[in-house]
């Protein structure tokens, strides 16, 4: 028993830390459903007065967010991961729940009409540029590609307008409309050979105060290469030097990637829970360790969420 306890409290080395950390991808979108079946998608809602970005193509309305996360056990001295990952959770705005059918149809039509007008204006401006410039001119190919993108967007919006008009005009069946938000999750890590591995996850629970979520693999199994964090029971919230493990650049459009191997970053933790880890190299969700390699929490803004709070989250 003593040997087992020593093994379970043994600190992680650099390789172990890297195999604890994962990149978490959260895809979120809003749906317009008819009789509980998705028919249209939109980017956001402005209260109960407007829907933004209505479209017939789900990918056009999907928000992608990359954060860090980590495999973790739920008990201090037992291998109790069962495929669970703790990571930040972001709700991409809410949707109004009290709108009746006619109000939803009206907002869908209004959103489509506003978009079509804007896209037509953009198309006219780009068509003029293409008419007066030659293929050899600097930037012509980029403008032509943008024009094609706007054309595709207009087709998707026009299709959305036709769909909602058709459903609303159906005299044989009175459709029930609703708005809802959907999200999918996956994690990306690296196995013992350094190969990139992507695993789909599902949401188990979330805490709105901490803005954290517990995710889990579909079969509740933990990959062989994963090294779950050990939530030791004693307090670790004292001023000290710390190490964080993260894929740099997450959250920065244009440079973020979920396939880059994580790096180890040094910083300091204050007794108040604040840290000085650089956000570019230690984004939200990055696991944090003592210099010796004991897990103590995760980065959440300018604070480090202590492992005792994570333990409470896993018990919900």
Predicted regions, residues:
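Hydrophobic membrane-insertion alpha-helices, especially the h-region
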Residues: 1-6
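A conserved glycine-rich beta-strand in the N-terminal activation segment of trypsin-fold
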Residues: 10, 34-36, 51-89, 198-202, ...
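Flexible, gly/ser-rich surface segments that form the specificity/activation loops bordering the active-site cleft
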Residues: 10, 64, 194-196, 223-281, ...
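Active-site-proximal beta-strands of protease catalytic cores
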Residues: 20-25, 82-89, 237-251, 284-307
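Mixed-charge, low-complexity intrinsically disordered segments
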Residues: 34-61, 98-177
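Conserved active-site neighborhood of the chymotrypsin/trypsin-like protease fold
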Residues: 79-98, 138, 142-241, 251-253, ...
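Active-site loop architecture of trypsin-fold serine endopeptidases
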Residues: 92-111, 115, 154, 168, ...
């Amino acid at each position: 028993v003593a040997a087992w306890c020593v093994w379970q409290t043994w600190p992680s080395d650099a390789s172990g830390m890297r195999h604890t950390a994962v990149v978490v991808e959260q895809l979120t979108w809003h749906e317009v459903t008819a009789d509980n079946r998705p028919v249209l998608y939109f980017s956001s809602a402005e209260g109960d007065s407007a829907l933004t970005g209505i479209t017939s193509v789900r990918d056009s309305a999907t928000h992608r967010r990359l954060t860090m996360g980590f495999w973790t056990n739920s008990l201090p001295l037992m291998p109790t991961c069962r495929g669970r990952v703790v990571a930040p959770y972001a709700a991409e705005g809410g949707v109004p729940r009290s709108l009746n059918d006619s109000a939803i149809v009206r907002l869908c039509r209004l959103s489509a009409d506003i978009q079509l007008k804007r896209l037509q204006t953009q198309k006219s401006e780009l068509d003029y540029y293409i008419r007066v410039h030659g293929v050899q001119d600097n930037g012509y190919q980029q403008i032509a590609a943008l024009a094609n993108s706007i054309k595709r967007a207009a087709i998707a919006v026009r299709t959305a307008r036709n769909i909602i008009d058709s459903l609303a005009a159906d005299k044989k069946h009175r459709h029930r409309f609703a708005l809802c938000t959907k999200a999918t999750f996956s994690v990306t890590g690296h196995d013992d050979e350094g190969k990139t591995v992507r695993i789909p996850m599902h949401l188990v629970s979330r805490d709105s105060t901490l803005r954290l979520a517990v995710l889990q693999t579909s079969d509740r199994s933990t990959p062989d290469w994963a090294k779950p964090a050990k939530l030791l029971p004693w307090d670790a919230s004292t001023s000290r030097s710390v190490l964080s493990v993260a894929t740099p650049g997450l959250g920065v459009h244009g440079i973020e990637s979920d396939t880059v191997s994580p790096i180890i970053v040094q910083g300091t933790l204050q007794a108040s829970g604040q840290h000085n880890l650089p956000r570019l190299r230690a984004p939200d969700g990055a696991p944090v360790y003592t210099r010796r390699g004991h897990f103590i929490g995760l980065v959440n803004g300018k604070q480090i969420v202590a492992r005792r709070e994570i333990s409470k989250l896993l018990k919900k």
